[in-house]
């Protein structure tokens, strides 16, 4: 009886320790869920194929796109927006995906070639046994064209993005850009000047493509097409905001309960946890960079 009781207490102690360990590696609740304020959008009503139509398949309202040796694929929103909430549930492919980029992003590249704005969520493919890297980026007025001035922040997620769908979103307002994962803010990019913030209308895009020259460990590992096709699945599309044609009275959704924007204290705590435990690169802390080109880092 005594030994049995000791064994049970030992098991209970281990479970408590295990639970504490799990919670230690999971962000605290943000306390507010902006995705719940936006209804899902039928893919055919909100988007169109951009390229690689033969590498795109719909099953009800779940979209699969894939990359093989012949082509990748991409889609684009029908409407351009000047602000709004943009998201989707995405599930990534496990295994060897080095060199492959899966993305959800805002851009006006087709409207302003060589001088465009862009706000990115990109999943950088990986090798066996290593996690994906989620890269967020902001380009302003051609900083992604020719002379690259990226504003990258990279994260290793606290879950396996190949096991299930998770919701990834960009909330873009005239004051700030907030990147969210399952409604947890992971990055806030405030407007500090017109020269460092995208203000022109953009479209929402998604794509899968070969970026072997840089995607995985700066191009060390390339796409290997013996593992093709490389797939990505999207569902629960959300795109709600002020279009390029909306009146000046149109007001974008906020990431928090505050109509004026910003984040609550609880959301800040969740974001701080992510940036402490999951962020692996911050362009503002890269001292090899010329930060005269990124003045928002020192203002």
Swiss-Prot record:
GO biological process, one term: cell wall macromolecule catabolic process
Subcellular location as annotated: Secreted, Cell wall; Secreted, Extracellular space, Apoplast
Active site: 118 (nucleophile), 122 (proton donor)
The enzyme's E.C. designation: 2.4.1.207
Tissue specificity field: Predominantly expressed in stems.
Domain GH16: 25-234
Catalytic reaction(s) noted: breaks a beta-(1->4) bond in the backbone of a xyloglucan and transfers the xyloglucanyl segment on to O-4 of the non-reducing terminal glucose residue of an acceptor, which can be a xyloglucan or an oligosaccharide of xyloglucan
GO cellular component term of the entry, any: apoplast
Keywords: Apoplast, Cell wall, Cell wall biogenesis/degradation, Disulfide bond, Glycosidase, Hydrolase, Secreted, Signal, Transferase
Lineage top rank: taxon: Eukaryota
Gene Ontology terms for molecular function: hydrolase activity, hydrolyzing O-glycosyl compounds; polysaccharide binding; xyloglucan:xyloglucosyl transferase activity
Main location: secreted
PTM text: Contains at least one intrachain disulfide bond essential for its enzymatic activity.
Function according to Swiss-Prot or TrEMBL: Catalyzes xyloglucan endohydrolysis (XEH) and/or endotransglycosylation (XET). Cleaves and religates xyloglucan polymers, an essential constituent of the primary cell wall, and thereby participates in cell wall construction of growing tissues.
Family: Belongs to the glycosyl hydrolase 16 family. XTH group 3 subfamily.
Any further remark recorded for this protein: In contrast to group 1 and group 2 endotransglucosylase/hydrolase proteins, it may not contain the ligase activity, and may catalyze endohydrolysis xyloglucan polymers only.
Name of the featured protein: Probable xyloglucan endotransglucosylase/hydrolase protein 32
Organism: Arabidopsis thaliana
Gene coding for it: XTH32
């Amino acid at each position: 009886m005594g030994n049995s009781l000791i064994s049970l207490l030992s098991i209970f102690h281990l479970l408590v320790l295990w639970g504490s360990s799990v919670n230690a590696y999971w962000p605290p609740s943000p306390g507010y869920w902006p995705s719940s304020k936006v209804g899902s959008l039928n893919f055919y009503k909100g988007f169109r194929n951009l390229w690689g139509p033969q590498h795109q398949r719909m099953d009800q309202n779940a979209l699969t796109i894939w990359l093989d040796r012949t082509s990748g694929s991409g889609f684009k929103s029908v409407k351009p927006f000047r602000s709004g909430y943009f998201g989707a549930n995405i599930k990534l492919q496990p295994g060897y995906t080095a060199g492959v980029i899966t993305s959800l992003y805002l851009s006006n590249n087709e409207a302003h070639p060589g001088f465009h704005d862009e706000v990115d969520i990109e999943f950088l493919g990986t090798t066996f046994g290593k996690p994906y890297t989620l890269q967020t980026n902001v380009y302003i007025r051609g900083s992604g064209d020719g002379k690259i001035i990226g504003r990258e922040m990279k994260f290793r997620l606290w879950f396996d993005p190949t096991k299930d769908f998770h919701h990834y979103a960009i909330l873009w307002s005239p004051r700030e850009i907030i990147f969210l994962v399952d409604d947890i803010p992971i990055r806030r990019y405030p407007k500090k000047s017109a020269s460092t913030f995208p203000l022109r209308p953009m479209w929402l895009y998604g794509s899968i493509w070969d970026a072997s020259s840089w995607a995985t460990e700066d191009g060390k590992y390339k796409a290997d097409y013996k593992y093709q096709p490389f797939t990505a699945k999207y569902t629960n599309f959300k795109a709600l905001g002020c279009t390029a044609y909306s009146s000046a009275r149109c007001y974008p959704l906020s990431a928090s309960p505050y109509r004026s924007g910003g984040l609550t204290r609880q959301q800040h705590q969740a974001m701080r946890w992510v940036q402490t435990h999951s962020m692996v690169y911050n362009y503002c802390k890269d001292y090899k960079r010329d930060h005269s080109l990124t003045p928002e880092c020192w203002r």
